[in-house]
Amino acid sequence: MSKKLTFQEIILTLQRFWNDQGCMLMQAYDNEKGAGTMSPYTFLRAIGPEPWNAAYVEPSRRPADGRYGENPNRLYQHHQFQVVMKPSPSNIQELYLESLEKLGINPLEHDIRFVEDNWENPSTGSAGLGWEVWLDGMEITQFTYFQQVGGLATSPVTAEVTYGLERLASYIQEVDSVYDIEWADGVKYGEIFIQPEYEHSKYSFEISDQEMLLENFDKFEKEAGRALEEGLVHPAYDYVLKCSHTFNLLDARGAVSVTERAGYIARIRNLARVVAKTFVAERKRLGYPLLDEETRAKLLAEDAE
């Protein structure tokens, strides 16, 4: 019987595969976020006309999902392997199935289903056509063709493939609890993450200072606005991410009502939309440097008319 891939070997296998498909291997972005989609490597690069192919691991924090390390499959923080390709290759689904084969999962020997699940992120004004990928009855991946990001229509269309690494590893290693996953030879997932899971859950549900978080949200929102007034897209977006994580902490604490919740989401969305518009305008000002010369000249000429 062949040795099962460790968690880090799964990551390395996916990195090698998508590198061979022309993706840049980016590193996780150093700001809290609820999903890999919120990284600037996806959110910003999915808009505008320039091509973009990238793959990266993104630790994703969802305070309300914390379970003190007691639930085998529900986590405060999990890991996503994110692939974004713009324009979307016509064979992206075939490439995805090929990536599963590299992980030792033969699509012909398993029940792999693409279940329609159109995606929406209200806090960033983003939406797209999507599918969940189910492997023998368990969701392991989200597939999305972005139609709108930051309130802007996407053209060309960006394809996003988001692997849930913990679920994938649980399946490959045949374990029932994420904490029993082998991260590396001789080191289990729980030996690294169960204590942080407990502590972050306790903080999110019991200890966090609600007044401080409410004040921080207002300050982060204001600072994002100040940065945008100066045309500073990336610092502004960092503060949008901080607003989002702060809201998630408030939500986990039960500190916002249903009505207030909608208001906070709208405030984050409004900022994200301004960031998106400012980013596209800045790329245009720079002459769309990632485009080939012919396409760049054509687009800039059209914009000048």
UniProtKB/Swiss-Prot annotation:
One annotated Gene Ontology cellular component of this protein: cytosol
Subcellular location: Cytoplasm
Gene Ontology terms for molecular function: ATP binding; catalytic activity, acting on a protein; glycine-tRNA ligase activity; transferase activity
One Pfam family per UniProt: tRNA-synt_2e
SUPFAM superfamilies: Class II aaRS and biotin synthetases
Domain of life: Bacteria
EC class name: ligase
GO BP annotation list: glycyl-tRNA aminoacylation
Record key words, sorted: Aminoacyl-tRNA synthetase, ATP-binding, Cytoplasm, Ligase, Nucleotide-binding, Protein biosynthesis
UniProt xrefs under InterPro entries: aa-tRNA-synth_II/BPL/LPL (IPR045864), Gly-tRNA-synth_heterodimer (IPR006194), Gly-tRNA_ligase_asu (IPR002310)
Primary location: cytoplasm
EC number: 6.1.1.14
PROSITE patterns reported for this sequence: AA_TRNA_LIGASE_II_GLYAB
Family to which the UniProt record says this protein belongs: Belongs to the class-II aminoacyl-tRNA synthetase family.
Subunit structure: Tetramer of two alpha and two beta subunits.
PANTHER family for this protein: GLYCINE--TRNA LIGASE, CHLOROPLASTIC_MITOCHONDRIAL 2, GLYCYL-TRNA SYNTHETASE
Record's protein name: Glycine--tRNA ligase alpha subunit
